[in-house]
């Protein structure tokens, strides 16, 4: 086995690990929703979508036996992580600067109209407001933890893309 094959195998293993972590984070969100009754807001649901996209792209990337396929799916996973960073940062901002919502979030109809909200309403249906701040976990709010998780997902993906940019075959 040459060095390139060993590196590809390691890369694929790391993608599986990343996917499992993202699925565990969504599982944690569902635990908070159903057992601690912390209703998800539109930005929470969008963050779930981004975690699931990262997991899907990482699992698919781990199935490829060539650098070209792995790199393509790493790019898609990194873009999903960037989308998650933007969404989580917006959520942190909204909670730090609450406005007047009248009990309605403008994103709710959009998020609830997406097909997964109809297929799996228990996972993707909006039930809360983005301004609602739940008790912090280890000193950070849920949007802050989500932001940390997206950054932690993005950094290794970006480093991998830079480190392996010459591997095409």
From Swiss-Prot:
Pfam families in the cross-refs: DsbB
Function: Required for disulfide bond formation in some periplasmic proteins. Acts by oxidizing the DsbA protein.
Protein name from the UniProt record: Disulfide bond formation protein B
Molecular function per GO: electron transfer activity; protein-disulfide reductase activity
Membrane topology value: Multi-pass membrane protein
Record HAMAP family: DsbB
Compartments reported by the entry: Cell inner membrane
Glycoprotein among keywords: no
Keywords noted in UniProt: Cell inner membrane, Cell membrane, Chaperone, Disulfide bond, Electron transport, Membrane, Oxidoreductase, Redox-active center, Transmembrane, Transmembrane helix, Transport
Segments on the Periplasmic face: 32-49, 90-144
Protein family (similarity comment): Belongs to the DsbB family.
Lineage: Bacteria, Pseudomonadati, Pseudomonadota, Betaproteobacteria, Burkholderiales
GO cellular component term of the entry, any: plasma membrane
GO biological process: protein folding
S-S bridge residues: 41-44, 102-130
Residues in compartment: Cytoplasmic: 1-14, 66-71, 164-169
């Amino acid at each position: 086995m040459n060095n390139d094959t060993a590196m590809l195998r390691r890369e694929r293993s790391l993608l599986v690990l990343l996917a499992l972590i993202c699925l565990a984070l969504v599982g944690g969100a569902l635990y908070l929703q159903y057992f601690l009754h912390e209703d998800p807001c539109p930005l929470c649901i969008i963050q779930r979508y981004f975690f699931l996209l990262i997991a899907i792209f990482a699992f698919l990337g781990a199935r490829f036996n060539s650098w070209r396929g792995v790199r393509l799916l790493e790019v898609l996973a990194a873009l999903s992580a960037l989308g998650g960073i933007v969404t989580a940062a917006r959520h942190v901002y909204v909670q730090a600067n609450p406005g007047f919502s009248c009990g309605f979030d403008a994103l709710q109809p959009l998020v609830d109209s997406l097909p997964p909200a109809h297929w799996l309403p228990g996972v993707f249906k909006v039930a809360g407001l983005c301004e609602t701040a739940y008790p912090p976990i280890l000193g950070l709010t849920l949007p802050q933890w989500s932001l940390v998780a997206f950054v932690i997902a993005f950094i290794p993906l970006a480093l991998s893309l830079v480190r392996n940019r010459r591997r095409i075959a």
